[in-house]
Amino acid sequence: MSRLTVFADTAPDTPLLDTQDYSEIAATLNDIGVRFERWEAREAFPSDASQEDVLAAYADEVKRICDEGGYATVDIIRVTEDTPNKPAIRAKFLDEHTHSEDEVRFFIEGAGVFYLRVEGKVHMVLCEQNDLISVPANTTHWFDMGPDARLAAIRFFNNEEGWVPNFTGSGIASKFPEFDYAVGAPAA
């Protein structure tokens, strides 16, 4: 189940908010300009499903998001138990960074955690199957797919280069709980 845990950016051991209530998650994220919504997954895909098959299954939703955000490129990121070099893939996203465009993801399967540092707080957002998150351009954040990563997500881009990070050089990400914390004990 999706989860939002909010910390002061100077207190990674003391949550200010910890909830699994969808309405509360969406409202709290909306307050910082982050879109969070839930779509119904229409089908489970085999690990070898083509990008075309997955995008065809969500064609209406993909078109709506592209039209609303002006996204020109859409692809699928898929990490399975058979993906080689998972530690390096995970490490690529773990340092705080920004993007010059929105970072939009719809989770088809599996889970990942976005950490959004906004207004002196870190919002740790566990996204799971059926979750759409849109992180606005220039928002400082990082992402953890976990040590045993398994996920598939539709990604939306304004540019053809795809995912282009601008690393902040901050070490803040290493101070906050990792993926296993987010998927651990249920929120209070």
Predicted regions and their residues:
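N-terminal leader/capping segments at the start of a protein or of a new domain
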Residues: 1-71
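Conserved short histidine dyad/triad with adjacent acidic residue
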Residues: 76-100
